[in-house]
UniProtKB/Swiss-Prot annotation:
Record PANTHER family: 50S RIBOSOMAL PROTEIN L3 (PTHR11229), LARGE RIBOSOMAL SUBUNIT PROTEIN UL3C (PTHR11229:SF16)
Listed name of the protein: Large ribosomal subunit protein uL3
InterPro entries attached to this UniProt entry: Ribosomal_uL3, Ribosomal_uL3_bac/org-type, Ribosomal_uL3_CS, Transl_B-barrel_sf
HAMAP family on file: Ribosomal_uL3_B
GO cellular component, as recorded: cytosolic large ribosomal subunit
Protein's gene: rplC
Lineage of the species this protein comes from: Bacteria, Pseudomonadati, Verrucomicrobiota, Verrucomicrobiia, Verrucomicrobiales
C-alpha cells in the first residue's frame, strides 16, 4: 500500500479533452489540510505506516481517548485520522512537508473510498434490481419479494438472502479512476467519473491497487 490523501467532495463538473474535444465528467475533491499525524516504524510499532490527519476539530468535540492521542502527538484535534501502510523507504524524513495535491499527477490511476448516499428502507426491486412479478393478468404480487426459500429443504431463510432493507450509507470503493487534473493553487484534484457520497462527504484517495 502507498500513501494517499483524505479529501472532501466538492461536487461534479465537466472538462473538455484538448485533443479529441470530448466532454469528460469529473469530480472535484478538496484535499487542503492533510497533515502528518504519526509515523510508525517496524522497529517501534511492528510495521511501517503513516497516519494522516484531516479537517481540524474543537477539542471539546473529541472523545477523551482521541484527545489524549492528539495531545501525545502535539497536534490539533481533527475529525479524521487515516493510516496508510507503506514501505520503509517511503517513510517521510523528520520535518518533511505535509502531503498535498502534488502527491498525485494528471494521468495517474487512483482508487477512491467513500460512504455512499443513504436511501433509507427500500424494497427488493430497488435495492437488488429484482425483475418484479407480473403487473397484470390477476397477479397480486407486483413489487413483492417473492419466495425466500421456505419450501426448500431445509425449510429456512438462508443467510445473505436478498431482501428489503436499509439501502446505501455504506463504505464503497471505486477502483481505477483517472486523475484528469491537479490544481495546486486551489488544493483540488479532478478525477474522472463519479465517486461515492454526497457533496461535503469525506473521501480517501490512494494510488490504484490493480494498475
Amino acid at each position: 500500500m502507498a500513501l494517499g490523501l483524505i479529501g472532501k467532495k466538492v461536487g461534479m463538473t465537466r472538462l473538455f479533452d484538448q485533443e479529441s474535444g470530448a466532454m469528460v465528467p469529473v469530480t472535484v475533491i478538496d484535499v487542503k489540510g492533510n497533515t502528518f499525524a504519526q509515523i510508525k516504524t517496524e522497529d517501534k510499532d511492528g510495521y511501517n505506516a503513516i497516519q494522516v490527519a484531516f479537517d481540524a476539530q474543537k477539542e471539546s468535540r473529541v472523545a477523551k481517548p482521541q484527545a489524549g492521542h492528539f495531545k501525545k502527538l502535539g497536534i490539533q484535534p481533527t475529525k479524521l485520522l487515516k493510516e496508510f501502510r507503506v514501505e520503509a523507504s517511503e517513510l517521510p524524513a523528520e520535518g518533511a512537508k505535509d502531503p498535498g495535491v502534488d502527491l498525485f499527477s494528471a494521468g495517474q490511476w487512483v482508487d477512491v473510498i467513500g460512504t455512499s448516499k443513504g436511501k433509507g428502507f427500500q424494497g427488493a426491486m430497488r435495492r437488488h434490481n429484482f425483475h418484479g412479478s407480473p403487473a397484470a393478468h390477476g397477479s397480486m404480487m407486483h413489487r413483492r419479494t417473492g419466495g425466500v426459500g421456505g419450501c426448500s429443504t431445509p425449510g429456512r431463510v438462508w443467510k445473505n438472502q436478498k431482501m428489503p432493507g436499509q439501502m446505501g450509507n455504506a463504505k464503497r470503493t471505486v477502483q481505477n479512476l483517472k486523475v484528469v487534473a491537479v490544481r495546486p493553487e486551489d488544493n483540488v484534484i479532478l478525477i474522472s467519473g463519479a465517486v461515492p457520497g454526497a457533496r461535503g462527504s469525506y473521501l480517501v484517495i490512494r494510488p490504484a491497487k490493480k494498475k
